[in-house]
Every structure is written in structure tokens, then in C-alpha cells.
């Protein structure tokens, strides 16, 4: 079977937005117009095709990035058939990890904004992630039929808050109830969609006379932005010649792909207006796999190599999502960067050094699937039969190995104890939790050594709530959940040298002997743990040095203050001694552990707590109450700004997570239910002495801090 679509006609895009900006409805309309779904799924009826997990339908928020393939020839049918692979990404802060992992495999993104709310806190998070992976983007201002809709206000917010060069390629005709269609600034024509056909048919008309002046102003700006793409266009523009439609589009495309501008469009997905033109903009301005840099990685000898998006290059792909499907078992979603792979082929997972056979290959449409025989460079598909693959692993041709850069996932900030309700649930629960942890790298499961309880950790209360809910629905496990606990950390503040750990045991015949001397010092925040071997003259034999490191690593999980994991510490092994007969790995492991514990005690240990970036949108009357309440929670208010359109105030603050439990309830009572807030993890900071003493006392019964 040969490739159906040439690679230059591929678009791998994400649809990304703040919760409630109408992203799922927008995706639904895309599926409808591209001819896949016949009845439009409305989110508020709980019927959207992309939101295919039960909890998503109940909560009306999108949790899992479902990948969908659609074909598009332009709304006037005047383009060659393009293949659009769409990754639907969640908009809730607790699922930022989902957005992050889909950004990694996209070539372009469509950012959806609410015409009234504009740039909201989550929009900023998503924008930062898109910047991190240098993803070119277009913006779609949705819900133009809402009261208070203002397209140009959103344009200003993108420029001021996100520092993006937002370039309108359309202007809305009317707004709120009077929203009729858009002015296409490239063609300088009005586009009006026919409501009877649910927006499938449309007509071009002249720009309405009252809008001509505004349209000409914005068109001049648009043409200037396009002309700056290259010298040929710039010269033509400066000499006063008019640029053709094609030249304007070429210039805008070049600058969008270079991440210099963000073309802006508008519409109302719910009213079937504007989504079709937004799809045309995806073809016009967002990159194909050929327009983005070749993917880089390392071979097995750590030499940097790259793979071009060509069917002729050896096969390479990145597994970006694992899902458990009730019918086919584990599904691995992957993005093929180069080469071709067929079902039945063997691929290598170089990180685990395991060869695996690709069973069936499926092309996904929300939660429906079509079996295909092969996958070409640039495509996104799901494979059945890969047992040991986790998110972020590379899949490669066994004869031409490449290891692509791994994804980095944030550490969880919140934990809960979870217990099965019955003995029968016990086994099912550990299976369910392991499955869920395999799917979601920001979710961790461990057993507390002292209490024997199972502890689950994640990125927020909603994150854990949904995972427990899934355990009940998908695995029939009834569980009781404890109160959320903060994931504290420990670190040190000073350097100590010459710390000794000596493990000596005489028992009858053969004894045990291990002796290590270390230097322990703090590292910059986020640097993690580092071990340096500075042994000279063989005072500790080579074969025992890894054992010393292992002993230290074992101890990292339980700090000396309250037993929390230790972070950002550097340990240098400087000296030691051994015994010809009695020394062994275990003895040196114990010596390493003893030295490290002693080093931590002497190096001024401190407790770290997670700090959250909190943003509250509140009516002006309640601003004082909200700020006072945040301060009482040990929050540092960092600023306040007006919400455009007289919509109250946006208060930004940094607050310890420990003080934020139950915040939504108290915010409701403070503001009569009229304020909303969002919260995301910012960084770890040293806990004040009084707080540290309370935490330590609760864990250990003593208050040493």
C-alpha cells in the first residue's frame, strides 16, 4: 500500500486552550466539516466525540488527548486533500502534563480563546509550553456570539500578556447576538455562513461599508507583516507594488513557521461559524513535517544524529501516550518521524534495550479505530502489542538506532493514602494503580514502609480524584481515599567535609568491613542529586564505589528531618579504607548510607514546601477579602490587574500548597460564588521555621528543625 497523502500535505496540530474556551466544541466541528461525524456532538449534552471517557462527559472537561485523523480540501474545495492529525489537549491545570506531552509531538498548534475571557491563566501555561518546544501557532477567538465578545481586546492581550505578535487575518462582522461572519483580510471579502446547512455552505460578499475603514487599517498591518518575511516581498512592498493573495499567504506562512507571528481568526464553533476558515488557516500557515527542523537524537555511542521526515530514512518514532483500552489492551500512541513501519515489524526500544513486535496498528478517531497496515514518516498512530514501552520512549529500526530526547515530567506535589474497601479489591487495586501510573508519568504509586499504606501522588486534587474515579469505573475497584497530603522535600544549606561512615561487624568467622568518607554540599534548586568519585590511590577498590553510591541513593528517599525525599545535594567520595577479607558490597553500601545520614544532620537540613502560582478572578467588590484571605494563607500577593471589559480584578499570588486545601469552598463563601481561581505548581521553597516544626512534629513526634 502506498502513501495516500504526500508528506508536505500533512498537518500535525494540537488544539489547545483554557478550560471552557470551547475547544472540544471546536474539535467536534472540525470532525463534522471534514466529514467524519454526522451529528454534531455538543459538550453540554455530554455527547462530544473527542471527550470519550465517561468522567470527561460528566465534568464537561477534556482529560485525555485523543488523537484523530481528518482530511480537508479547503472550505471551497480548492486545496489538494490534506491530512490533519489532531491531538485534543486538556485545558485544566492539573492536566498540564497532557498538554506538555502532546506539544512534544506536534508541528503546529491552534490556540482557542474565549472572546470574553481572552487570555486566562491556563492560556499562559500552554503558551509557555508551546514556546519551550518552539511550536508555531495560530489563534482562534471562539464564542464571538457571547455577550461581551471583543476580538481586538483578545488581540491586545496576546501581545501584552503572552508577548506574541498576534496578526488578525480576519475581523468579526458584528458581535454577540449580532455576530454574522468574518471579513477575510487577505481576500478583502466578507464570509457569511449559511445557518440552515449548519455552516457547510457559505458565500463571499463585499466588505460591509461601515467596516471598510477598520478593515483597511488591519489589512495594511497584515501586508506589512507578510512583507517582512523575505527581501523579495519587502522590496516589492517598499516600492509601492501591491502583494498578491498568494504572496501575502506565503509571507505569513514563512513568519508563522519561524515563530515570529501568530495569525488570528475568529468565529463561533457552537453557531457553526468560522471553524471552516480556521481549518483553511491550518493548511495556509501551519507547518508540514517538512517545514520543521529534522528530529535530533543520539546513537548508541552517544554521538548526535538526526532523522529527516522521509520514508527513505530508517524508522524512528516517539511514544507519547499510553492508554489502556477495554477491548484491545494497551495502546501506545506514537509519532513517526522518519521511515516506514508495518504491522508485524520488530522495533527496538533503545532505552530499555528491548526488541518488540508491533502487533496491530490503529488510526484513531476519538475512541473509534481503523486498522491500518503501515505508518509513514510524519504520521500519528496507535500500536497494540508493545508491552514494555512507557511514555517518552523511542521506537527505532533495530539496525539504525537513534535515541530521541526523553520527555521530562514534573514531580508530583500532592499525595493521598488509598485503601481497598475489601480483600478482593486489594489485588485488583495494585494492578489498576500500576496501569494508571504507566499511562500517566506525573502519577506515582508507592507503599509507605512504616504504615504499609499505598500512597498515590499527582499534580493536584482533581488529578487524583479522577484517577481514583477511573480505578472504580475501569477496574471495578472500590477504594477509600485519605486526606490529601503535601509532598514536602528536604535539602541542606551548608557544606560539610570529612563525614565518616564506618560499618564493622564481627560475627564468628568472616566479618564485614566498609569505610567511606564524604563531603556533602547543597546544589542549586532543581539540580537534583550528584555523586562524584574522588578516590585516589585505590583506598577503596573500584568495585565497591558503586555500592557506596547505592547506599547514598537508598537514603535519599528518607531525609533526616521528617523522612521526606532529599533533593539538590552533591556528594563527593573523598577517602575510605577496606579489609582484604571482610570488605564486600553490602558493607560499603551500609557505610555510604551511614556517612550520608550523618552528613545531612551536620549540613543544616531544611524542609522545603511546594509553592503554587494562584490566580483569582473576582468581582471588584470582593478584591479586599480575596487578598486578605490569600495573605492569611501565607500567600505573597504579586500583583493585581483589571479584567478587560469591566469584568472585575485578576489577583496573582504565590501561596504554599499546604494552605490551599479546601480553597474553592472558602472562595465561594467569600465571594458569593462569583470568583474563580486556578492554581499550578511553581517551585519548592524553604518552609518557615514554625511550619517546619509542625510538619516534623506531625511526622516524628519531635520538633527538631
Swiss-Prot record:
Coiled coil: none
HAMAP family found in the cross-reference section: EF_G_EF_2_B
Name the UniProt record assigns to this protein: Elongation factor G 2
High-level lineage: Bacteria, Pseudomonadati, Pseudomonadota, Betaproteobacteria, Burkholderiales
Record-linked NCBIfam families: EF-G, PRK12740.1-5, small_GTP
Residue intervals of the tr-type G domain: 8-290
A Pfam family matched in the record: EFG_C
GO cellular component, one term: cytoplasm
Keyword tRNA-binding included in the entry's annotation: no
Annotated binding of GTP, by residue: 17-24, 88-92, 142-145
Chain's role: Catalyzes the GTP-dependent ribosomal translocation step during translation elongation. During this step, the ribosome changes from the pre-translocational (PRE) to the post-translocational (POST) state as the newly formed A-site-bound peptidyl-tRNA and P-site-bound deacylated tRNA move to the P and E sites, respectively. Catalyzes the coordinated movement of the two tRNA molecules, the mRNA and conformational changes in the ribosome.
PROSITE patterns given in the database record: G_TR_1, G_TR_2
Subcellular location: Cytoplasm
SMART domains with a match to the protein in the record: EFG_C, EFG_IV
Keywords: Cytoplasm, Elongation factor, GTP-binding, Nucleotide-binding, Protein biosynthesis
CDD domains reported in the protein's UniProt record: EF-G, EFG_III, EFG_mtEFG1_IV, EFG_mtEFG_C, EFG_mtEFG_II
Family: Belongs to the TRAFAC class translation factor GTPase superfamily. Classic translation factor GTPase family. EF-G/EF-2 subfamily.
Biological process, per Gene Ontology: ribosome disassembly
PANTHER family: RIBOSOME-RELEASING FACTOR 2, MITOCHONDRIAL (PTHR43261:SF1), TRANSLATION ELONGATION FACTOR G-RELATED (PTHR43261)
MF terms in GO: GTP binding; GTPase activity; guanosine tetraphosphate binding; translation elongation factor activity
Record gene name: fusA2
Main location: cytoplasm
Amino acid at each position: 500500500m502506498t502513501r495516500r497523502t504526500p508528506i508536505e500535505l500533512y498537518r500535525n496540530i494540537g488544539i489547545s486552550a483554557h478550560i471552557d474556551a470551547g475547544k472540544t466544541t471546536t474539535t467536534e466541528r472540525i470532525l463534522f466539516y471534514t466529514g467524519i461525524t454526522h451529528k454534531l456532538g455538543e459538550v453540554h449534552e455530554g455527547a462530544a466525540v473527542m471527550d470519550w471517557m465517561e468522567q470527561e462527559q460528566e465534568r464537561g472537561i477534556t482529560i485525555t488527548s485523543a488523537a484523530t485523523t481528518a482530511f480537508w480540501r479547503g472550505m471551497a474545495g480548492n486545496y489538494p486533500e490534506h491530512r490533519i492529525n489532531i491531538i485534543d489537549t486538556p485545558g485544566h491545570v492539573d492536566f498540564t502534563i497532557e498538554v506538555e506531552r502532546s506539544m512534544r509531538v506536534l508541528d503546529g498548534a491552534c490556540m482557542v480563546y474565549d472572546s470574553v475571557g481572552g487570555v486566562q491563566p491556563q492560556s499562559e501555561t500552554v503558551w509557555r509550553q508551546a514556546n519551550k518546544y518552539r511550536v508555531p501557532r495560530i489563534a482562534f477567538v471562539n464564542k464571538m456570539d457571547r455577550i461581551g465578545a471583543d476580538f481586538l481586546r483578545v488581540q491586545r492581550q496576546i501581545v501584552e500578556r503572552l508577548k506574541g505578535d498576534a496578526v488578525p487575518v480576519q475581523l468579526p462582522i458584528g458581535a454577540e447576538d449580532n455576530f454574522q461572519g468574518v471579513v477575510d483580510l487577505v481576500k478583502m471579502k466578507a464570509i457569511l455562513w449559511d445557518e440552515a446547512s449548519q455552516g457547510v455552505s457559505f458565500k463571499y460578499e463585499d466588505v460591509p461599508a461601515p467596516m471598510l475603514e477598520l478593515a483597511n487599517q488591519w489589512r495594511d498591518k497584515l501586508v506589512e507583516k507578510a512583507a517582512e518575511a523575505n527581501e523579495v516581498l519587502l522590496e516589492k512592498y517598499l516600492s509601492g507594488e501591491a502583494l498578491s493573495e498568494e504572496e501575502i499567504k506565503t509571507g505569513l506562512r514563512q513568519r508563522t513557521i519561524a515563530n515570529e507571528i501568530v495569525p488570528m481568526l475568529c468565529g463561533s464553533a457552537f453557531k457553526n461559524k468560522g471553524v471552516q476558515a480556521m481549518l483553511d488557516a491550518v493548511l495556509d500557515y501551519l507547518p508540514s513535517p517538512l517545514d520543521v527542523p529534522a528530529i535530533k537524537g543520539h546513537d548508541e555511542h552517544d554521538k548526535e544524529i538526526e532523522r529527516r521526515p522521509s520514508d527513505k530514512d530508517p524508522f524512528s518514532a516517539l511514544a507519547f501516550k499510553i492508554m489502556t483500552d477495554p477491548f484491545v489492551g494497551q495502546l501506545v500512541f506514537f509519532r513517526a518521524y522518519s521511515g516506514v513501519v508495518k504491522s508485524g515489524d520488530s522495533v527496538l526500544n533503545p532505552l530499555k534495550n528491548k526488541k518488540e513486535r508491533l502487533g496491530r496498528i490503529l488510526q484513531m478517531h476519538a475512541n473509534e479505530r481503523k486498522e491500518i497496515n503501515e505508518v509513514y514518516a510524519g504520521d500519528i498512530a496507535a500500536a497494540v502489542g508493545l508491552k514494555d514501552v512507557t511514555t517518552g520512549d523511542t521506537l527505532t529500526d533495530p539496525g539504525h538506532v537513534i535515541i530521541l530526547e526523553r520527555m521530562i515530567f514534573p514531580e508530583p506535589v500532592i499525595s493521598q493514602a488509598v485503601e481497598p474497601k475489601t480483600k478482593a479489591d486489594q489485588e485488583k487495586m495494585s494492578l489498576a494503580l500500576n496501569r494508571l501510573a504507566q499511562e500517566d508519568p506525573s502519577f506515582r504509586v508507592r507503599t509507605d514502609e512504616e504504615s504499609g499504606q499505598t500512597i498515590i501522588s499527582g499534580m493536584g486534587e482533581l488529578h487524583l480524584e479522577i484517577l481514583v474515579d477511573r480505578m472504580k469505573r475501569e477496574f471495578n475497584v472500590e477504594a477509600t481515599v485519605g486526606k490529601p497530603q503535601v509532598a514536602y522535600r528536604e535539602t541542606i544549606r551548608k557544606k560539610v567535609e570529612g563525614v565518616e561512615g564506618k560499618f564493622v561487624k564481627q560475627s564468628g568467622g568472616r566479618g564485614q568491613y566498609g569505610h567511606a568518607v564524604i563531603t556533602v554540599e547543597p546544589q542549586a534548586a532543581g539540580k537534583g542529586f550528584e555523586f562524584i568519585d574522588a578516590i585516589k590511590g585505590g583506598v577503596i577498590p573500584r568495585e565497591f564505589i558503586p555500592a557506596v553510591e547505592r547506599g547514598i541513593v537508598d537514603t535519599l528517599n528518607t531525609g533526616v528531618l521528617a523522612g521526606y525525599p532529599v533533593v539538590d545535594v552533591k556528594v563527593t567520595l573523598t577517602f575510605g579504607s577496606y579489609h582484604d577479607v571482610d570488605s564486600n558490597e553490602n558493607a560499603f553500601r551500609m557505610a555510604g548510607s551511614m556517612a550520608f545520614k550523618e552528613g545531612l544532620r551536620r549540613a543544616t537540613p531544611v524542609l522545603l514546601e511546594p509553592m503554587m502560582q494562584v490566580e483569582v478572578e473576582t468581582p471588584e467588590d470582593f478584591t479586599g477579602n480575596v487578598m486578605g484571605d490569600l495573605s492569611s494563607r501565607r500567600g505573597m500577593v504579586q500583583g493585581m490587574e483589571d479584567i478587560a471589559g469591566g469584568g472585575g480584578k485578576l489577583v496573582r499570588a504565590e501561596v504554599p500548597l499546604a494552605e490551599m486545601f479546601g480553597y474553592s469552598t472558602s472562595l465561594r463563601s467569600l465571594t458569593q460564588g462569583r470568583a474563580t481561581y486556578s492554581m499550578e505548581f511553581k517551585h519548592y521553597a524553604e518552609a518557615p521555621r514554625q511550619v517546619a516544626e509542625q510538619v516534623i512534629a506531625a511526622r516524628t513526634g519531635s520538633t527538631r528543625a
